[in-house]
């Protein structure tokens, strides 16, 4: 996704090495406890650094979608949260770190799409925090630090990898666990 204009996380100039105005690291900001305790600050960072509504899939996204259409690719296992694989036409995508494309109300559970989340008329007054029609805070469907990965997605991912004749690994440093261990499973 970096070729599409989405910044990476772990390089020298990546998001995790950037300074923030919140007196803590970016990794602390995208933690469950920070979200729960400083929701408005979380959303300010999230909206400015993790949401890129204008990015488009690149040639690699389209090539992978084409391979899937041809029956040559069974699944995409990704740590990306940007939804670009689906935007390119891929159907069987396992987003193990979740997606920015959805959010759900922490009060009533209602689900919303990214367009709703980005619509400022739904934001808490004076903040970036999107609210449900019931007034509850929306939580993005991304896996924050201190949260568990979805067991069903992990099982599907490991199964797809273990059954693959050929494995294409791209755009990752393979240092984030447990995803990095999937290739050894």
Regions found by a protein language model. Name each.
Residues 1-185:
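Conserved catalytic core of sirtuin-type NAD+-dependent deacylases
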């Amino acid at each position: 996704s970096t070729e599409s204009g989405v910044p990476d996380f772990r390089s020298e100039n990546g998001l995790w090495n950037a300074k923030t105005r919140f007196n803590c690291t970016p990794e602390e900001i995208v933690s469950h406890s920070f979200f729960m305790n400083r929701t408005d600050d979380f959303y300010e960072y999230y909206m400015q650094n993790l949401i890129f509504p204008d990015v488009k899939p690149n040639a690699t996204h389209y090539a992978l979608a084409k391979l899937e259409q041809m029956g040559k690719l069974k699944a995409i296992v990704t740590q990306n949260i940007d939804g670009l694989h689906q935007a390119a036409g891929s159907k069987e995508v396992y987003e193990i770190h979740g997606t920015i494309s959805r959010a759900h109300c922490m009060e009533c559970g209602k689900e919303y799409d990214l367009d709703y989340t980005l619509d400022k008329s739904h934001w808490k007054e004076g903040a970036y925090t999107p609210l449900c029609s019931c007034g509850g805070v929306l939580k993005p469907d991304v896996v924050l630090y201190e949260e568990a990965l979805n067991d069903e997605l992990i099982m599907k991912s490991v199964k797809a990898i273990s059954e693959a004749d050929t494995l294409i690994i791209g755009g990752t440093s393979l240092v984030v666990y447990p995803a990095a261990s999937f290739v050894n499973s």
